[in-house]
Amino acid sequence: AMYEDNPFWVLYERGIESYYGNHTLSHRVLGTKETVSNISQQDMKQYFDERYAADNTVLAVAGCLDFDEVVAQANSLCGHWPTSGTARSYQPVVPQSDDFTMHLPTLAQAYVALIAPFPGANDDDRYAAALLSHILGGADGSRLHWALIETGLSEDAAAYFDPRDRTGEFLAYAACQPDQLEQVESLLRSEIDGLITSLTESDLERARAVFATASTLSEELSSGRMRRLGRLWTYSGEYRSLEDELKRIS
């Protein structure tokens, strides 16, 4: 219910469902009232037993530790966990082209969103994709900020890159007055179309600095380092140092 009160989230979920079509990625993570209501206690237990098993779990640790001791403790505490034989299947993604309009009479503003294919979380092109998304609509000095927000046409405008396992999507959106929707969408598309040809080395240097700083600061916390290592291992099955990560960003 909380998400249903957020106009952007309503549009986003409907857009993702349309974009991925019959693919499992079109399913809402939190489900719908209908799907949640139809889940039984036995269904939840079966799902937990299948997914939260020893052969489907990654243990990531960071900080001042003794690796051999960590392994011994993990074996002691978790060695008895059963395996379930669960495996991830990778259904081919075929992006769907669709144009739809939702009418919500309680809203005073109009919202527009565009979704397109982008690299996945295990694709090295994700670094370039992240930089492009940031330059286009990831900060106050972004292209969308100057074209739509600073001009007073939009209250909110941004671009995101959402990397997933072996696929990803790009999202650009804006909120505005209904009578300005056509103009805002036109400018939104124009900024996307002209991004590559208008890029400068200064744009890239600033974006690289933002990501490098964020990565470095995150590594100063054990929790941040664990999340990065765990996510990287889950997606690619490899270890990568912060230094290597920074080289890929630059």
Question: What residues fall within each predicted segment?
Answer:
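Mature, solvent-exposed C-terminal subdomains and processed small-chain segments of exported/organellar
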Residues: A1-A53, C64-S250
